[in-house]
Amino acid sequence: MPDTELEIEYSQAVRDHRAAHSRLVMLLRRMAMESLGDVVPGASSIAAVGEFNEDGIPTLRIQRVFDAEGRVLFDVDVGHSDREVEDAVDFVDTEYVDVLIDLAPGDYFGSVVID
């Protein structure tokens, strides 16, 4: 049986891990929005879809980017005439948004909104 000191240390480590996890999720969401905001002025929210890809790996992919009034600024099905926008969406997908589904799969499968 673990001694009391070990149980206390373990409990603290669990609390620290949960706090760090929550902070990382919040920072990933902010990084995604601010990165898109650099190339899509007025970007306020992202509509994304979380699913398993053909290799069985969970992915979260941006479908649309909206402004604060709900107007579509980017739609993956339409694309964008500015290659910088397309590149930014691809970067945000792999560097920030995909990490969200790894960290909290229950929150990011199916249709989700990130703001």
What do these predicted ranges mean?
Residues 3, 7, 52-115:
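Detector for the mature cores of small, proteolytically processed
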Residues 3-43:
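Contiguous, amphipathic alpha-helical segments that mediate oligomerization or scaffolding
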